[in-house]
Regions:
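Short, membrane-interfacial amphipathic segments enriched in basic
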Residues: 2-42, 221, 225
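Membrane-interface helix starts
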Residues: 36-61, 240
Length: 260
């Protein structure tokens, strides 16, 4: 009984360490082959167009409604203390520091991330990746690397769009609907938001999230078994692992950036 338990625990630990090693090898192999994209920039541009369009509409709509809700809730909270003029600052800080990068990353994982996993998994199931290897074409360089860098570039751009649309939503609710002074709304935002501490740190978060989400999505599809069931399971794992990774990374980055 004890021997069976130890074998089970040891086997699980071995598989976990092995998966970390395989993912690290795939990641660094992909980074090493990435300079080859300079000879084929069209691959990167095509993937930027596809991956960006996957999430564009949902990012815009979500950013608008999140900004409107933040403006509404923020006004009722600040108004209790006679500080409703600071609504613009509250909306801008909430979006640039936290809500923009985190919600964009979660939406990207659920929309573009699952699409990437399914695409790579189906290519593997259809033996397209094996055919590339037989023709002396490295699938990591030709398939994974362009999609990886497209995802890394797309997430910060989508985050900026989410935050901008969210600020617009907060403005529509706070100024146009409730009647907060427009000058105070923008001046408080301009005076209180620090470019390096707030905007740049939010940008760094979005880049880190983009790296993590895109690689998780690609790796899950690349390592999935060539069966419809396992490809479906890989898309589910992409969402679960990416979501947990986003929250963990957000906590760690927030602790490093804003602890002082």
């Amino acid at each position: 009984m004890m021997r069976r338990f130890l074998v089970s625990v040891g086997g699980g630990a071995r598989d976990y360490v092995e998966s970390i090693g395989l993912s690290a090898r795939t990641f660094f192999t992909m980074l090493g082959l990435s300079p080859g994209l300079l000879r084929r920039p069209r691959l990167l541009v095509e993937q930027l167009h596809v991956i960006g369009n996957y999430s564009l509409l949902i990012i815009i709509l979500s950013g608008l409604f999140v900004g409107m809700v933040l403006g509404l809730q923020g006004y009722y909270t600040l108004n209790k203390y006679g500080a409703s003029e600071s609504l613009g600052l509250l909306v801008a800080l909430g979006l640039t520091r936290e809500l923009g990068p985190v919600i964009t990353a979660l939406l990207f994982a659920g929309r573009a991330g699952t699409s990437l996993t399914a695409e790579i998994g189906l290519m593997k199931a259809g033996e397209q990746l094996s055919a590339m290897e037989m023709m002396a074409v490295n699938p990591i360089q030709r398939v994974l690397a362009p999609r990886f860098w497209a995802g890394v570039i797309s997430v910060p751009l989508l985050t900026a769009m989410f935050s901008a649309v969210g600020i617009l939503g907060g403005y529509l609710i706070g100024v146009e609907l409730i009647g907060v002074d427009e000058g105070a709304f923008w001046s408080q935002m301009q005076g209180g938001v620090d470019v390096w501490k707030d905007v740049f740190n939010g940008f760094v978060k979005s880049v880190v999230f983009g790296i993590a989400i895109t690689f998780i999505a690609l790796y899950q599809g690349y390592e999935a078994q060539p069966t419809p069931e396992d490809v479906s399971g890989a898309t589910t794992r992409t969402v679960v692992i990416s979501s947990l990774m986003i929250w963990w990374l957000d906590f760690m980055l927030t602790a490093l950036m804003f602890s002082k």
